[in-house]
Amino acid sequence: MNNKEIGKLGEDFTVEFLSSRGFIVLERNYKVSFGEIDIIARKGDILIFVEVKTRRNLDFGMPVESVSFEKQNRIKKIAEIYVKNKQLRFKEIRFDIMSIILSPKGEVLNWEYLPNAF
């Protein structure tokens, strides 16, 4: 299983997680020239940008630890572009992280959803 496949498994799990809790997924893999946002969703008057981090082992630490300050700033800039291009207005904008650990077979062993992560 390559990194792209691992990432897709994590994003698929996150979309199911969000949908089952009343979120409406608006976009997946929203790309601009300098990066992307994994998932954009809404729940009521809240617009949520979700960074999904998925790993098969903890050799490099917990998945959430790889969301650096620079990555957070990049996501915020992409979010600004998204809101401006779509001309959206929400009462609140939130940045969440989904951290997922997979088994070698690609099954979700552990996950943690962090609302308002940054």
UniProtKB/Swiss-Prot annotation:
Instruction: Please provide an example of a Pfam family that matches this protein in its UniProt record.
Output: UPF0102
InterPro entries with a match to the protein in the record: Restrct_endonuc-II-like, tRNA_endonuc-like_dom_sf, UPF0102_YraN-like
Q: Which GO terms describe its molecular function?
A: nucleic acid binding
Q: Where are the transmembrane segments?
A: none
What superkingdom does the record give?
Bacteria
The record's PANTHER family line, in alphabetical order, gives: UPF0102 PROTEIN YRAN
Family per record: Belongs to the UPF0102 family.
NCBIfam families per record: PRK12497.1-3 (NF009150), PRK12497.3-3 (NF009154), YraN family protein (TIGR00252)
Q: What is this protein called?
A: UPF0102 protein Dtur_1530
